[in-house]
C-alpha cells in the first residue's frame, strides 16, 4: 500500500517540493494558485511544516470540496449524490476525483438558471 510506496520512494520531501513548485509555477503566479481537494486542511498544515516554500507560493484561500458535500447533503438532501470515489489514495486519482466531484457540484447544484428580462 501507501506506506510501502513511501518507504521505497527515492523522492525526498525537498525534491518533491521543488518538483511541485516547478509544475505549479508553469500554470499559476505566486499567490494565485489555490489548493483544492477533499479535506485539505491536513494537507495545508503538512505543506506549512514540510514544504514552506510551496505553502507560501499558494494563495491563502483554499477550495475544500468536502465542504460542498456537507452543505449539499444538509441543504438539499433530496438531491442526487455526487460521484463516488475509488478510495485508491493515489495522489493523481485523488486529484482527478476531487475535480470531477467539484465539476459535478457546478453542473448539478450551482448551475445558473436561464433567466430573461
Task: Describe the predicted segments one by one.
Residues 1-37, 83:
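Conserved non-catalytic scaffold segment of RNase H-like nuclease domains
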Residues 15-18, 22, 70, 93-96, ...:
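Short, contiguous clusters of charged residues that form electrostatic/catalytic patches at enzyme active sites
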Residues 18, 44-45, 56, 66, ...:
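Non-catalytic, well-ordered alpha-helical scaffold segments
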Residues 23, 58-60, 75, 104-105:
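Tryptophan-centric aromatic hotspots in well-structured domains and transmembrane helices
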Residues 31-41, 45-51, 77-117:
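Acidic, Mg2+-coordinating catalytic module of metal-dependent nucleases/exonucleases
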Residues 47-63:
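Short, low-complexity, polybasic intrinsically disordered segments
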Amino acid at each position: 500500500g501507501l506506506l510501502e510506496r513511501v518507504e521505497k520512494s527515492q523522492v525526498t520531501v525537498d525534491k518533491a517540493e521543488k518538483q511541485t513548485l516547478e509544475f505549479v509555477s508553469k500554470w499559476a503566479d505566486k499567490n494565485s494558485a489555490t489548493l483544492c481537494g477533499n479535506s485539505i486542511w491536513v494537507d495545508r498544515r503538512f505543506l506549512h511544516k514540510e514544504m514552506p516554500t510551496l505553502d507560501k507560493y499558494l494563495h491563502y484561500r483554499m477550495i475544500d470540496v468536502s465542504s460542498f458535500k456537507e452543505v449539499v447533503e444538509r441543504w438539499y438532501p433530496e438531491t442526487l449524490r455526487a460521484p463516488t470515489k475509488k478510495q485508491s489514495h493515489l495522489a493523481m486519482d485523488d486529484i482527478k476525483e476531487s475535480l470531477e466531484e467539484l465539476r459535478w457540484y457546478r453542473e448539478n447544484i450551482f448551475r445558473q438558471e436561464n433567466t430573461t428580462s
